[in-house]
Structure formats: C-alpha cells, structure tokens
C-alpha cells in the first residue's frame, strides 16, 4: 500500500462507527494511531491495513468495557468477575454524605456506618477505607509511623493478586520490616527475642495458601500477650472478613470449609488492638477495607493524612451499610454470598437438571465442587453437582461467553463446566438460552 492511499482519520473513524458503539473521540484516537502504525509499516516494507488494526483494537477495548455477566464458574467470590454480589446499591442523587441533618452543618463521613460496624462486632470503634491493602497501609503508617519497626513472621510475608507483596506494601507505608521466625515455624519467643524495639506487631492470616507438614505459628489468641510484652500494638489482618467463626447465620453451624478461618469478633476478644478485613470476601459486601478495634488506635488512623486518599464514596457506604445491617438484624443468611454458599446440593441439582432440559443441550450432570474464591479458605471446596459439556471445549466456552449477557463457565480437561451455585436462580433461564445456542 502506498502511504498516499491511506484513508483519512475522519474516513476511517466513520467506517468504524457503524460497527462499534463507542464515543467518537475514542474512534478518532484509535483511527489516528492505526493510520500512523500502518504508515510506519508501509515505509518499512511490511504494509498492513489500518482498518484491521483499528478494528482489532476496538474489539479488545469493547470486550473490556464494564458489563454484566453470568458467573457460572462455581467460584462464588470470583475476583475477576467482581467478587461478592452486593446489596443496597441504590443511592440518591444527593445525600447526607457529610451533612449533619440535626445542626445543618458539616458532618462526619460514614459516622453511622462506623458506629454500626463497631456495635456489630463488639469493637470500640471502626473505620472503612477503599480496600484491605489500604487499611493495612494506613494502620502501619498511623500506628508504627515513618521508620517504625514492625515485627511479622517470615511465614506470613504474603503475595496477593497482581504481584503485590506485603514487604513492598510495608516499605511504601514508611515502616521497616522486622522478620522473625522461619518460613514454616515461628514461635512467640522469636518475637520477644528480636533485636531492638518494635513499634507494632503484625500477624497476617495466609488466606490464599496453606502450609502443611512440619509447621508452627503463633495463633491469634496468643499474639496480644506477645505484643504487650514488647510494648507495641497488635495489628491483626484476618483478611477474609468472617465476622464470627461460629457463623450463627448458617443453619447447623459453620461448614467444614470455614474451619481454619479466624473470626473478627474472636480476634477482638483475644485482645487485638486493631483487626483488619476485606468487605468483599466472606463478609459478602462491596470492595472495602475495614478496621475495627480500640478507639485510640482507630482515631489515629482516621486522623492520618493518607486516610483521606483512601476514603470510600456514597455507593460503597450504602452497600456496606446494607451488608452490616443484615448481620446486625440476624439476616446475614439472606446475603447473596451466603445464599449461594449454603444452598443444598439437592437444590443445585434440581436447578441444573431443569436448565439442561430447557436448553435441549447434550450434557451430563456430574459431581463437582465450588470454590468460595477471592483468595479465601485455600484448598477447601463446597460439594456441588455441575453440568459437564464434553468436546470442543474452546468452542463451547466461547459460545457461552459470546452470549448476551455473557455466561462465563469453567473449562478444564477438554470440557466446559456450568456450575449453578454461583448463578442467581433468576439467571437460570439466561444460562438455558445460552446453552441452547451452542
């Protein structure tokens, strides 16, 4: 192609407008860059079609645009699909976000939510920020301070999703990491014999992996006395946000897959000064990082300059308020995550059979498993009957994902699997229609 034959930016953008429903500014930018790339390729002797470049790029962008999907993977808290289905998302156009209706003056953001959380878990005070990594960053910066020394077991120097590592987060917060113990064995004496003084003691629940065999650690129940002997506050990062290890909202008591999860209330009862946890994992709420504990420590966190950079907005406040009100009123079992997690296998089997029959698809009902997900309860699953679709794994998966709305299934061992435990019953008809179109 001669460079003089390349289309104008407006002409190419106009052609793309008929295929892609995106703002014209994005069409113009994409067209201009595609033409520039095509011109360079032509001059180097490898001509390419700018229309093809632009279309490929817009297809990729369009597929990444936020949209609703049906999660049929069986991973209940699927990080890539938004984790916990949330409640209470209706937010008025204007609200009393930071307005005191009694005095007509500026109020404190999240005042009701903070009081609700504290009373629900039995803490003196509470604070909510944008996510749990942010809560930990803030706790370290506020309670240990710049150049403060923070002791943590080597076996808990975790890496979370996206290659974010605890030592890096600690360094960014301005504190110095004091490693104690070994990867597989840490004792209380390792903390108390660490050289020098420490400004805080941190314990992190390894919620996304499991270490077995010749191991030893200091349980949450013993850490407060260790920290007290060092004259330092104890920060407990329990991660997944299980409010009560007894799970009183689950009929018949806590299921086996919760056996190793620390409870927020129990960790507070042990004497932790600050307990940190996520809002969108086992709690079943929106993305948030929650800090509960002693009023003095929480106030220091709230007054730290970085707290403003981590604060939450109105929709998050509304959703998290609805979530904690469900716990406070004894209605936690109705939260979408717990409804999915505790649904009897027989109910899932009945729904799956009905979907299979309605779709007319050739598939088999087999024994399978669901995962709580979101880096919680590693290695533990929930028994679940699933629909197995054999043959042409990629074709089946792609067909479901191309449906509107997309139905996201699991795929492995040459087959696609549809797991209705992670699907709301109201979406069963969507799954059936998607299966019928394979």
Task: Name what the model sees in each region.
Residues 6-7, 70-74, 283-286, 382, ...:
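Short Gly/Ser/Thr- and Asp/Glu-enriched loop/turn motifs at secondary-structure junctions
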Residues 44-86:
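Long amphipathic N-terminal alpha/beta scaffold segment
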Residues 65-66, 125-127, 277, 405-410:
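A short linear hydrophobic-aromatic micro-motif
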Residues 105-314, 318-326, 356, 434:
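Conserved PLP-enzyme active-site core in the AAT-like
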Residues 316-317, 321, 325-373:
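Conserved PLP-dependent catalytic core of the aminotransferase class-I/II
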């Amino acid at each position: 192609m001669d460079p003089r034959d390349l289309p104008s930016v407006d002409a190419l953008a106009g052609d793309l407008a008929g295929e892609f429903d995106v703002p014209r500014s994005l069409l113009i930018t994409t067209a201009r860059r595609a033409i520039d790339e095509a011109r360079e390729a032509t001059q180097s002797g490898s001509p390419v079609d700018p229309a093809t470049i632009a279309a490929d790029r817009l297809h990729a962008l369009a597929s990444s645009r936020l949209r609703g999907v049906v999660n049929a993977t069986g991973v209940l808290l699927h990080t890539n699909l938004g984790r916990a289905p949330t409640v209470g998302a209706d937010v008025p156009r204007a609200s009393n976000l930071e307005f005191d209706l009694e005095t007509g003056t500026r109020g404190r953001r999240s005042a009701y939510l903070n009081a609700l959380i504290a009373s629900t878990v039995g803490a003196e005070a509470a604070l909510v920020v944008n996510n749990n990594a942010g809560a930990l960053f803030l706790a370290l910066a506020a309670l240990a301070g710049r150049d403060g020394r923070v002791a943590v077991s080597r076996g808990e120097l975790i890496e979370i999703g996206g290659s974010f590592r605890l030592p890096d987060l600690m360094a960014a917060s301005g504190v110095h990491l004091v490693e104690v113990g070994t990867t597989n064995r840490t004792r209380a004496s390792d903390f108390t014999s660490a050289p020098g003084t420490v400004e805080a003691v941190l314990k992190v629940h390894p919620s996304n992996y499991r270490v077995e065999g010749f191991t030893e650690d200091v349980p949450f129940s013993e850490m407060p006395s260790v920290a007290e002997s060092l004259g330092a506050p104890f920060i407990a990062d329990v991660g997944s946000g299980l409010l009560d290890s007894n799970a009183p909202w689950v009929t018949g008591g806590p299921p086996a897959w919760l056996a190793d999860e620390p409870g927020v209330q129990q960790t507070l009862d042990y004497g932790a000064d600050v307990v940190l946890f996520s809002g969108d994992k086992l709690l079943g709420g929106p993305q948030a990082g929650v800090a509960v504990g002693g009023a003095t420590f929480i106030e220091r966190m709230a007054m730290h300059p970085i707290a403003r950079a981590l604060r939450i907005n109105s929709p998050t406040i509304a959703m998290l308020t609805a979530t904690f009100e469900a716990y406070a009123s004894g209605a936690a079992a109705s939260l979408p995550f717990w409804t999915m997690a505790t649904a009897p296998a027989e109910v899932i089997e009945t729904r799956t059979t009905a979907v299979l029959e309605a779709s007319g698809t050739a598939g088999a009902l087999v024994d399978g498993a669901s995962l709580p997900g979101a880096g919680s309860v590693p290695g533990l699953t929930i028994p679940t009957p699933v629909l197995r679709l054999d043959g042409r794994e990629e074709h089946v998966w792609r067909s479901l994902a191309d449906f509107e709305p997309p139905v996201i299934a699991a795929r492995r061992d040459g087959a696609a699997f549809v797991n209705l435990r992670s699907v709301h019953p109201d979406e069963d008809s969507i799954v059936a229609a998607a299966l019928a179109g394979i």
